[in-house]
């Protein structure tokens, strides 16, 4: 699996790395980590990263996207990271590349790249890339290791999710050997502004429940406009306020925006991915997302979640 990816990387002098829009720690970590991995082992290659702003994760080193013209894609390899559907890829110009390569740990929803390295047994795309480096004998540098470790930490819920296994800790340990400061990293990841803490309190009071105890939050466009946070902070950031409620196995956050309703689906017990896929989304068995057209459709999704069985 990894050999084919390495040969494709060796083949091209210009490589452009994409990831999903509204990036999380795994998307940014895998993008920066892959760039540093390639530059460390093949210094003669030109490597770019592209996409929308890193937002919450802008503290990560060298994560600012490069501004490149279309002709850079001529005879270039585009690497797509941490993305299962085309609609989520930030910067659609990957289609201009000579060839495409994807690394992902989500359930496959679409054929996107010429070569796919997809394995859902990894807790993160960063974990997959770390194993790729170790198994192919590629060298890491400190920035690559720190970036990849960041993605592993965030996508595993600080190593608490079901996706974590013994391999996760072996890979994390290999990265930690590079000696970066984890205390500083955790402070950047988990110390919040007081406004975010107040926002969590507000959203905790918005929680409602279905007859089968699915927890859910609905934010209308007007409510979103009234809070001091962007749509990603509300959608992805507030879904976690429902995660530690006793007796709640499944929860969902609906955030209405100008372009549709952002849906974040989570469960401790059930596979929510088929529900997300039904509405054009995807992700993992117990953490998926989708964007749907309106709140009426959101109620249909909520009904489907309420009827989940093992």
Q: Model-derived features: where do they sit?
A:
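Fold-independent oxyanion-binding glycine-rich loops
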Residues: 20, 52-53, 81-84, 103-106, ...
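Short alpha-helices
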Residues: 106-171
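Hydrophobic helix-and-loop "lid/oligomerization" segment in the mid-to-C-terminal part
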Residues: 2-21, 29-58, 70, 74-75, ...
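Short, motif-level signal for alpha-helix interfacial/capping segments enriched in acidic residues
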Residues: 1-4, 81-82, 133-135
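Short glycine/serine/threonine-rich phosphate/pyrophosphate-binding segments
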Residues: 25-31, 87-89
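Structural signal for conserved beta-strand scaffold positions within catalytic alpha/beta enzyme cores
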Residues: 49, 80, 102, 117-119, ...
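Active-site cofactor/cluster-binding pocket
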Residues: 61-115
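Conserved beta-strand segments of alpha/beta enzyme cores
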Residues: 46-48, 99, 116, 139
């Amino acid at each position: 699996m990894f050999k084919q990816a390495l040969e494709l990387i060796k083949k091209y002098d210009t490589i452009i790395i994409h990831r999903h829009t509204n990036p999380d720690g795994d998307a940014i970590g895998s993008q920066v980590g892959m760039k540093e991995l390639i530059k460390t082992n093949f210094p003669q290659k030109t490597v770019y990263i592209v996409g929308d702003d890193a937002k919450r994760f802008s503290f990560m080193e060298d994560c600012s996207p490069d501004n490149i013209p279309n002709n850079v894609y001529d005879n270039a390899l585009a690497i797509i990271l941490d993305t299962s559907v085309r609609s989520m890829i930030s910067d659609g110009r990957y289609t201009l590349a000579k060839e495409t390569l994807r690394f992902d740990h989500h359930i496959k929803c679409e054929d996107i790249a010429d070569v796919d390295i997809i394995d859902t047994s990894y807790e993160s795309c960063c974990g997959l890339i770390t194993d790729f480096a170790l198994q192919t004998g590629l060298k890491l540098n400190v920035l690559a290791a720190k970036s990849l470790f960041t993605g592993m930490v965030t996508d595993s819920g600080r190593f608490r999710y079901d996706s974590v296994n013994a391999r996760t800790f072996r890979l994390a340990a290999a990265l930690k050997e590079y000696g970066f400061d984890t205390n500083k990293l955790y402070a950047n990841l988990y110390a919040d502004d007081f406004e975010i803490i107040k926002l969590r309190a507000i959203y905790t009071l918005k929680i409602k429940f279905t007859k089968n105890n699915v927890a859910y939050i609905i934010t209308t466009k007007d409510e979103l406009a009234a809070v001091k946070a962007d749509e990603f902070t509300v959608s992805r950031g507030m879904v976690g306020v429902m995660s530690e409620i006793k007796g709640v196995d499944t929860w969902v956050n609906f955030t209405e925006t100008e372009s549709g309703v952002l849906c974040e689906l989570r469960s401790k017990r059930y596979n929510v991915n088929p529900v997300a896929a039904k509405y054009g989304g995807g992700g993992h068995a117990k953490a998926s997302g989708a964007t749907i057209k309106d709140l009426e459709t959101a109620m249909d999704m909520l009904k489907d979640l309420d009827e989940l069985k093992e």
